[in-house]
């Protein structure tokens, strides 16, 4: 079969309207710059995936409506949007060359990027952190606060590590022996 790709600017506008891309990208780049990105996208790189690799990209990283299965971008769109988002606040003088170099590196799989960046950096979630270490002290407010932090980070696709080293050990007394841990 044949298919036609949606030009990047049109794709961005549609995905912002649908609420799946962060609208801030349009504040960072001009339409001319976004059209330039479109000329850099190498669609043939999508054809170099193995079946398993493409399934993983589609299932885990492409922006989509997981309830309907509707996918809103191609792998190359994803890579370009990641590069554009990561370098959006760099100086105008250098950022375009950084976007191109980074796009080329990630779209050719020369470097790997963490799941939260691949899955969420161009979305309204804008998750940049890959792994987060959550500390907890040996008090109920600290334990509950840590639980809340864990829930919020997991909802934003971050990996979690928990430092529970300051929580008392098993068989320790709680409230003077009222409860045993």
Predicted features by range, described:
Residues 1-181:
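Extended catalytic cores of very large enzyme megasubunits
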């Amino acid at each position: 079969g044949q298919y036609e790709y949606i030009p990047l600017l049109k794709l961005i506008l549609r995905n912002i309207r649908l609420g799946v891309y962060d609208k801030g990208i349009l504040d960072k780049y001009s339409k001319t710059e976004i059209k330039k990105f479109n000329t850099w996208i190498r669609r043939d790189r999508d054809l170099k995936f193995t079946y398993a690799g493409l399934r993983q990209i589609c299932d885990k990283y492409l922006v989509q409506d997981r309830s309907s299965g509707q996918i809103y971008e191609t792998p190359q769109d994803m890579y370009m949007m990641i590069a554009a988002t990561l370098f959006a606040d760099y100086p105008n003088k250098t950022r375009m060359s950084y976007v191109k170099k980074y796009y080329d590196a990630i779209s050719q799989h020369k470097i790997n990027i963490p799941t939260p960046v691949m899955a969420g950096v161009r979305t309204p979630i804008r998750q940049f952190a890959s792994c987060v270490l959550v500390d907890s002290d040996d008090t109920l407010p600290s334990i509950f606060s840590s639980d809340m932090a864990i829930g919020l980070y997991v909802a934003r696709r971050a990996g979690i590590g928990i430092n529970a080293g300051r929580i008392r050990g098993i068989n320790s007394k709680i409230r003077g022996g009222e409860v045993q841990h």
